[in-house]
Curated annotation (Swiss-Prot):
Signal peptide: 1-18
GO CC terms: membrane; neuron projection
Lineage: Eukaryota, Metazoa, Chordata, Craniata, Vertebrata
Entries under SUPFAM superfamilies matching the protein: Immunoglobulin (SSF48726)
Glycosylation-annotated residues: N34, N35, N46, N135, N147, N159, N211, N269, N280, N284, N330, N357, N376
UniProt-recorded name of the protein: V-set and immunoglobulin domain-containing protein 10
Main subcellular localisation: membrane
Highest taxon of source: Eukaryota
Amino acid sequence: MMITSAVVLYLLLLSHQTVSEEQVQQFVIGEKGNNTTLHCLDHPVNASSVLYQWKKDGAVVATQNPPNPSVHLSISENGFLRISGLQLIDEGLYECESQAKGGRSWQTLSKIQLTIAAGPTGVSLDISPATFLNNGTLFVHKGSNVNFSCSSESNPSQNLTWTVDNLASDNPEREFGSKSPLAFSITNIQPLDQGTYTCTSQNTLSRRTANKTQELLVYYAPERHPECSWELGDKPSDVLFICSWFGGYPVPTLTWQEVEGAAEGPTINLTTSQQTEELNVSVNRSILHDGDKVKCTGHHVTGVEKSCSFTLKIPYPTGQPLATALEGTNITISCTETSSLPPAKTVWKKNDDLIENTSKYIVQENRPALTLTIVNVTKADEGVYYCYSENPLGARELEVYLNVKTSAGNGGAIVGIFVSVLVMMIGIVVGVTVYTKRDRICIGLRFSQLDDDRVDVLSLVDSDEEEIFHEAVPRLPPVTNGHATTLVEIHRIPSCDHEDIADSTEQSDQTRANLTEAGPQRAELQPAV
């Protein structure tokens, strides 16, 4: 506002300086295309006694009672100048002159400065890059760089202002200036920047304004993929397929369709499309088959397309088919089901009766496992238990046979354990005994080998030559019966020498004879030669 006032004041001063010498008495502002009337200020009281004419910039432009009246310029009876349909060329200094009837001179009565204000017209704005919708609204993609430009025509000058009307901005003014076009830009535009953008142009002289508005939307697709899920329908025979894709603007278009059907049986014939963030489709379970593949595709106006899918699978519970328990104890059996789509409901049964939590049975679900604990097992608990899994495609079960053993049946096991321990202890004793007697056992084996490999001859020889014993001969300790110990020398004879066996035999006889004698003797085992 301050800038506008300053411009108007400047123009007025400029006009005043231009015609100051002419003593301008009035300044009039007219708008292009409108009508205006210039008053002759000092006209006589009896206007009918005088004639009037008007000059513009020193040239006569209008007289009373002209031979060819002008629609654009005309003079009233009281001397007022009426200008119809103001044009820019009408701008200038106007002088009102009067002359008495029959007189010959004209007298200037007033001088008026007429200024023509035009516009603003032709206000236009441009927002790019942007796309028009059918209703004329523009949209841009989130994260893009957007340029804004506004222009208009105005005389003598104008002020341009960009404003935005949205909930996120406290200050609606975005840009201001007097030069046309007026431009600014937004880098990495976000959803908070969407709103109604207005370009306003104001004539600095006439204060007339003109504007143009444009609604701008910021579109963006969801960042994540669609999510496919399922649940049982309102009817036991129905299953509900759920596709959701949240987080985009505007809402996407979701489509359910069958991608791959089963080899046999009727197809799902699932093709449903809707502009929404969540699309639910109810399908009768009778047309669902193991191996059917369904897909949900999300289309967004920004051009983004994403999808999710799943393949239908019948349940297949797994686990150990045999369990053994001791009577009077607790036992836990379990089964696991992970392959079914939609997820199956799994329960434990016995004899087609559903097993629920009681003081006897404890059922616990810890997905994907389902456990059954039988408390204080008895012989009556023996039998087949069923892990039953069912989903909309069908049902399957796992048979688990429970074998219950009584305490009397453990006697054989106890005896077996006792015998095993006894055999182990005997083995340990034998091993320790052999280890402690290893020297005797080894020596006995050694002598038995010597008897097999060679023939030894024992010879006892009496000797009177005491000098052959130069060193003290060690004595063996005396035996308890008091007899003297005989010293024996053993000389080995290889078993392969058999020539003098007869002589050796004679010596052996002699040796046996000598051993019968009492007293210290010397035995010598000499090899036969």
